[in-house]
């Protein structure tokens, strides 16, 4: 057993980003950074819940990851499945306890997300399109969680909408990328059931919908600091063009990585836009 695998299995960079997005949701809702204590609690809940989600996903994806991602801790034998399960449950449990310290709504929200992550990994992930929607929903509600923690939604609703739409697209492209491994395990993902070309077109539709949704905060009065969203929309549009031109697992893999970069830049745009509102 490798000690570093306890960090690696969390996918800490992703969890770090998720935690920051939770704080961003609160910031966008308020128009300024929340108190340090509140920010820390939001970050910890989201980081630990994200960690739980990654671990339980790897737990149930053990056989598939032997093909698609053999270097991850579980398939390479660096960590046993049972230890990983206990580890994940513990982290998720701590997240729920911390959420209770914020407010009751935040507690219920965290508990619901915890259960949905388990249900997704256990049952919903192999279901065509349903699994994609669940992941996108969990991603989209991250900024909403921060907003709920401070008792105000505000512009965080637009951030959540954009996050949901772009992550539906990204999850579809990831399924296209992983189609061979998923086929080997008998999964029924969207590209397996509907084909790569049709799935690519659906991913493009959600990509374009993201661009349209990204314009809504402008009408709602977000600050001038939101201007980098133009770059984000350009990346998404180019990614959509690429996958339409050559719908294939290789292209989908490249495109989903570009969308991930776009997501990071969008987070930055919303942050700048929220703190410059009214300037």
Swiss-Prot record:
Its EC number is 2.5.1.42. Pathway: Membrane lipid metabolism; glycerophospholipid metabolism. Keywords: Cell membrane, Lipid biosynthesis, Lipid metabolism, Magnesium, Membrane, Phospholipid biosynthesis, Phospholipid metabolism, Transferase, Transmembrane, Transmembrane helix. It is found in: Cell membrane. This is Digeranylgeranylglyceryl phosphate synthase. It catalyses: sn-3-O-(geranylgeranyl)glycerol 1-phosphate + (2E,6E,10E)-geranylgeranyl diphosphate = 2,3-bis-O-(geranylgeranyl)-sn-glycerol 1-phosphate + diphosphate. One of its GO terms (biological process) is glycerophospholipid biosynthetic process. GO terms for cellular component: plasma membrane. Gene3D superfamilies: UbiA prenyltransferase (1.20.120.1780). Prenyltransferase that catalyzes the transfer of the geranylgeranyl moiety of geranylgeranyl diphosphate (GGPP) to the C2 hydroxyl of (S)-3-O-geranylgeranylglyceryl phosphate (GGGP). This reaction is the second ether-bond-formation step in the biosynthesis of archaeal membrane lipids. GO terms for molecular function: geranylgeranylglycerol-phosphate geranylgeranyltransferase activity; magnesium ion binding. It is a multi-pass membrane protein. The keyword Transferase applies.
